[in-house]
Amino acid sequence: RRMESEGGGFNLAAMQKDLLINVVPFLNGGNVHRLIAKILSRDPDGTPDFEYISELLEQAEPGSHGLFFLPYVTGERFPIMDSSVRGSFLGLSQETTAADLAQSVLEGVAFSIRQGLELFDQPAKKITLIGGGARERRWCRILSNVMGQKIFVYKDPDLLPALAIASAVFVAEGVIPDYQAFISTLESRGHCDTVEPDPEISARYHGIYQRYKGIYPLVREFYSEKY
């Protein structure tokens, strides 16, 4: 069905007749994960240290001890459309730890995704993560708790975008009848893990998320001024 949303969301005509693909161009996701892995890297050359981020996330607490991160490091197109805005930490204190920094950054991305999905006229029925960032299962856990929904992660999630694009060719060439055939094959043959939300943590995140939504309106004017 046609998507009517705010932000930079739009519709693409799919290869399959009378089917629309709802596209929401989140600009900040895996790049933010890579950025914090670079900033906190133990490597003198600053090579992104994803292993260290995983270790920090194991130590972290939901809510990052009051630290918030607005993840728009390259501007954003969805859930807000603003090319001037940039990433921001709010709530830094003398007690802030590296684990808080790592946790808050990935929480910020999760909050942004939740805010974007809430712009749709219907709630998401199923959330499947793709891309390299899905390899960080602690981040998947954060997203599941922020969304309050089960998250599905298939084997080799970084390859799924290429397979999905290939499925369009399969439909066009008649190799498969429709996209549902591709999805059914993936569900039956592709190894899939699920991440379940923790009800107590999800309830806590709901309140934190309400505060997060107030950050962008506060900083928008600051970033809109040119110097």
Residue map of PLM features:
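Active-site core segments that coordinate phosphate-bearing ligands/cofactors
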Residues: 1-130, 135-227
